Amino acid sequence: MINIRRMWQPLTATPFLATAAHHEILPCKSLQGWIRCFWGGIVGAGASPTRIIPDVCADLIYHIDETAGRIIQASFCGVSDVCGTAHLPMIPGHTVSTFAIRFHAFGAYAFADDALRGTLNGFESPEVRFGRLDRALRARLPELRGLSARTAYAQSVLLAFQCRENPLVETAADALLCHRGTATISEWAHELFISSRQLERLLGEYWGMTPKKGSALVRYQALYQEICHGTLTDVHDAVARYGFADQAHLCREFRRYHGENVSRFFKTSCENGRTMEENGVYPPEEVST
């Protein structure tokens, strides 16, 4: 069922925008089950803060001083369950760029050296849990120019890695996405032939979150994706499809993660669908295998 993970494409707060400061490149087919995209760009003078929403992803981010040819900041940002803003570093008189790998929440563990327990809403140095990958990336990123070249190199590094795959973790991800976060924890665990307590330990170690949190985030993102794609245009249909108690419950949950009222998005859902059909999501540049 790896195709379910390949088809799962979480959206950011600005799914219709591609700029010099932020562009996305999809990974090759072999990595799509674990990685959402590679992203980055040039940070311009006076760049405004970037709005962040929960996308059920974790990011390995490098900020590079192109003028001096060195990495000035690197971080691993765990899965987030809150909306907020991110400020990009700038150096007067220097050109600064960003390069990042956006892992699916259920995919980062495969390239990590250590468990991801405690990384929810976390911000730490990549060497803490991704030492091998961090060293390999630091060796070449500053000397490479442009997002495409850095993506090609990072992808070659990731493909050469001995991933620590866990079949039960992969099956858990398939089940979660198949139900789009609407199954109860006991139903989810039963489908995996384990107890709810075992599921909680499994996800805590490999995803850095509880089953309840994972379900809530996937349900929110699945709802947001359908609205943005224009495939869900009625709030009452959304209540029934995603198992909310009523419209008020849906609105509260959406505002909790998105920081805005969902009604505005439903009003523009048909227009959103046409926009995405015409432009795509950050019109991605597919990486050749």
PLM region spans:
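Long, low-complexity intrinsically disordered regions
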Residues: 186-189, 200-205, 212-215
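Residue-level "edge-of-site" marker
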Residues: 202, 217, 252, 268
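Alpha-helical bundle regulatory/interaction domains
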Residues: 1-173, 177-186, 192-196, 209-210, ...
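A secondary-structure capping/hinge motif
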Residues: 205-209, 254-263
